C-alpha cells in the first residue's frame, strides 16, 4: 500500500485568521479538536502534497484554528487555502472488536443476505440514535442504520458489509 493510499482525508483548510499564520479548519471528524491529536499532517491539492507539523491549535467559537511550524504570516497561510488535510491511517488509535472508523466503511460494497449487491457506502450520517450508512447503487440511494439488527457482518479484508435489508424496504 502506498503512502497516499494509507492516508485518510480529515478535513480541509477553509481560510486564514489574523496575520501570524493561523488557519481556519473545516474538520470531517466527530469532534473538530480531535485533529489536534495528530502532530503530522499532509496537505493535498491538485496532486501536490505538503507535509507539515502542527505547532498549536485551539477551538474558538466552535471553529478549529491551527498554526503549523514555519507558517508565520498571513500570505504564506493563505497559500494553503483549499488544501485537503490527510492523516496517516497508522496514526489512528486501534479499534475494538466490531468498532470501525467511518473512513474504513466508506467505499465498502454492501450486499444483502440474498447476495444482491445494494451498492457502495458513499458516506455515513449521525442521527443521534445511531449512525446510518448511505449506500449508492443501481437501486438508488439506500439508508441503512448501522446497528446489529440490520448489519450482519463487516469484513474489512474483502471490503464487504452484509446487511439484513431487502430492496423493498
Curated annotation (Swiss-Prot):
Record domain PRC barrel: where: 97-169
Superkingdom of origin organism: Bacteria
Molecular function GO terms recorded: ribosome binding
Keyword rRNA processing: yes
Main location: cytoplasm
Entry-linked PANTHER family: RIBOSOME MATURATION FACTOR RIMM (PTHR33692:SF1)
Protein name as catalogued: Ribosome maturation factor RimM
